[in-house]
């Protein structure tokens, strides 16, 4: 605990030099002397002068530069509930040694708050928070504390505003009072990612109502802190946008409380999303385009805020481990350099979780051994921020292996403790296992029971499924339907429209057609015959590999080698569209390994009917002025594929660039969508048997080419659209049909297309077909970049997928 020395004579001597301050001494003081602007004790040791300095928020953030999050600790129900050890001062010292200058200490208060009207915080919990804060400050670092996972009661809607605000103010009154005499090395953050949980716009900037209420929450908290006395009238305070997002819609509506100069904007930016957060996204980062894109995003924040005198802290960023260390290192250095050079401090999200290849592996520090899992990333952050570490990092030498389960009869999936029931105890135990809080389960069959999706791995995917089961959003686990991979029933799952009439191998053409299989061994190769320049993506054990092409030839391609010997999962995905030619898979080879049983088809099925947008035309391109190149068409990262993955569904994509309902792009001759739709192989005239794939959902995204260069006749367009819906309804009588518009149209073309499609939907509803819906995608405005020829970027596809996912969930309850 700090000792505050109140010595009138010393203050009188120094007040004219240093202004108002507190003096912190590490030991009892027996005498003083002044040396220049320094206060020394009797032994000549400098006493640290700490007070609310005359420093701007911009300059303070420049001092911070680079920070670290003590994640999944005090923001858990209890400090060690999520598998991390109890925080020690040695842990914080280790962070300081590497050059980090600040620690964000997320705190969840919910389970430590008493009833209304006082909402008294448990004294022991508040004491523990203060103890950890002191660890940070004693190391000469900045600390940030907040109200973190309290979204269950901080609800930004008008209906809940008053109740939420009353509790929030009471909580902050107590926090602010406890810390009121701390100096400006302690910062407050009003809330963490405030949002309306479960709403369609939760992660899309929120609704106007959400943003308006969040502004009122921020104002109430800032006013409460300012009125609490001590140094809090000058305390630096962070305020977030809706969900702390950097989306324009959220930034535009953010109101700075009282235009207070000591208020700092709080943003979270795991950018780019598909590299940083999406386990199924790209594992590579480092191209000139990648760097320019990230720099552009930071420029936008700088120009909006910092350039105009408003400080910004990116309180959370980071990248998950996809066995791609070199890309993560390059990204970390570039991110830190570009942010810090613009006066923006950045804080790595370290949740303590380490399981390479899993979706939550953000940990840098091994908190148990006080060594570094990824010293290369830490060093890259410091190089980027221009910080010299105090010591060289000690790496953590080994990885934690994931156990391979042995099949046992009568397994109750989810019952990890073996008590014959599936409940919250099992869920907590599974989370602790994943976070390495425990090394084994009480039940001998716990390892098998924990793998509820039967992918031979125990990770956060299993935890999400467990939570869904307990919340009754699913009634059984995928493992209950899956086959155990073995050599007795080898096979391949074909997803998409395939023709099996040629004994040499199946053929396909449409975007997103893919083969999925399990194999045992260390390597895998495939032989492909392609009629044009087709590009493919292999995903092995959930990790996307670099794409490759087979261009109008037959080629054998080594997909992967050097794997640990054992069972592996492989998806081989056709990235390019049908117009680039048909593809034939002539066989797989696994070296000394073998093909295992085919994966079980997903129960949920979605069919997408569209044009170049659904094909993902040019979504990996670097410029809207760039012409189409097959390499940059990645249907795996299309809104269609992303939506399907979001919903644990398969996707059949029937899409063709430039195609329309009544006219093709620019009036080009050739078949329209109704001419293409019935075929498995559109060039060979092989028709599709619609009974082979009966989706619960059909998504139609057509009209862009009917309204781009000229405008379709209303009667013809409406009639053609209704004919397509009739064909879909004839093939799939019970399907939910989502009729979409966007995101490439604008002006009159957009207005007409929207009007006509809405009319079609309304006519269907009036005629008794209530399973036809209208969806408008966010229209692109350049804020998320462009692909080739003005087509949507991957970031735009993600926004489209978020919108469509929310709509489907809302209508079907998925």
Swiss-Prot record:
Record remark on domains: Contains an N-terminal module that displays cellulase activity (CtCel5C), a central type I dockerin module (Doc) that facilitates the integration of the enzyme into the cellulosome, and a C-terminal module, CtCE2, which displays dual activities: it catalyzes the deacetylation of plant polysaccharides and also potentiates the activity of its appended cellulase catalytic module through its non-catalytic cellulose binding function.
SUPFAM superfamilies hit by this protein: (Trans)glycosidases (SSF51445), SGNH hydrolase (SSF52266), Type I dockerin domain (SSF63446)
Organism: Acetivibrio thermocellus (strain ATCC 27405 / DSM 1237 / JCM 9322 / NBRC 103400 / NCIMB 10682 / NRRL B-4536 / VPI 7372) (Clostridium thermocellum)
PANTHER family hit by this protein: ESTERASE, SGNH HYDROLASE-TYPE (PTHR37834:SF2), GDSL-LIKE LIPASE/ACYLHYDROLASE DOMAIN PROTEIN (AFU_ORTHOLOGUE AFUA_2G00620) (PTHR37834)
Residues involved in Ca(2+) 1 binding: 415, 417, 419-421, 426
UniProt subcellular location: Secreted
Keywords: Calcium, Carbohydrate metabolism, Cellulose degradation, Glycosidase, Hydrolase, Metal-binding, Multifunctional enzyme, Polysaccharide degradation, Secreted, Signal
Biological pathway: Glycan metabolism; cellulose degradation; Glycan degradation; xylan degradation
Activity: how regulated: Esterase activity of the CE2 module is inhibited when this domain binds to cellohexaose or beta-glucan.
E.C. number: 3.2.1.4, 3.1.1.-, 3.1.1.72
Protein's recorded name: Cellulase/esterase CelE
Residue numbers binding Ca(2+) 2: 451-452, 457, 462
Active site positions: 193 (proton donor), 316 (nucleophile), 612 (nucleophile)
UniProt record similarity statement: In the N-terminal section; belongs to the glycosyl hydrolase 5 (cellulase A) family.
Transmembrane keyword on record: no
Region annotation (Cellulase) ranges: 35-354
Site (Transition state stabilizer): 658, 705
Esterase: annotated segments: 490-814
